């Protein structure tokens, strides 16, 4: 079966909500035509939506390797790398004794790769807040809110960190 037929099957699986089968179909298309960057790209997108980060990264990198001039492929690769950095930061934050400097570093990397990632801004706010750096925490929460004005957690964090920053300023003035 040619790669295109597997791609059609993958899209049919996506429409029916079976992402695992869609990924298998994309991988069959890739096996039929390993040098087709579009197949790797499509597979990577579906893997990313399923939070299969390693597989998403591998296929995104291969798409860029095969078609380095494709802007969409390079942008998608950066998005996958950003999501992985966010996931690593989240894992670090759940540790018993998080290394906040490391978390902030990972989140800054994620935001360099994808500045529209509101989750990275929220985690950045939480990390700065945990360090008592309330002004920076409020700024990060404000950025998340700017990207997603209806985000309830961003609203709450922004108000909380702004209030804490003001209190801290008053204490240092007196």
Describe each PLM feature range.
Residues 19, 53, 98-100, 134:
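TPR-repeat structural position
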Residues 27-31, 62-65, 108-112, 143-146:
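Conserved structural position within tetratricopeptide repeats
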């Amino acid at each position: 079966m040619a790669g295109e037929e597997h791609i059609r099957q993958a899209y049919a699986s996506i429409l029916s909500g079976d992402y695992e089968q869609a990924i298998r179909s994309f991988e069959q298309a890739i096996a039929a035509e390993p040098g087709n960057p579009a197949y790797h790209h499509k597979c990577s997108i579906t893997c990313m939506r399923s939070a299969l980060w390693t597989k998403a990264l591998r296929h995104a990198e291969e798409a860029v390797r095969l078609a380095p001039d494709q802007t969409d492929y390079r942008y998608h690769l950066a998005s996958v790398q950003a999501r992985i950095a966010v996931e690593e930061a989240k894992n670090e934050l759940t540790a018993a004794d998080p290394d906040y400097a490391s978390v902030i570093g990972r989140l800054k990397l994620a935001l360099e790769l994808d500045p529209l990632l509101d989750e990275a801004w929220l985690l950045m706010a939480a990390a700065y807040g945990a360090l008592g750096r309330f002004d920076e925490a409020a700024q990060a929460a404000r950025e998340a809110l700017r990207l997603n004005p209806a985000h309830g957690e961003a609203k709450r964090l922004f108000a909380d960190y702004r209030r804490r920053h003001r209190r801290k300023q008053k204490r240092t003035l007196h």
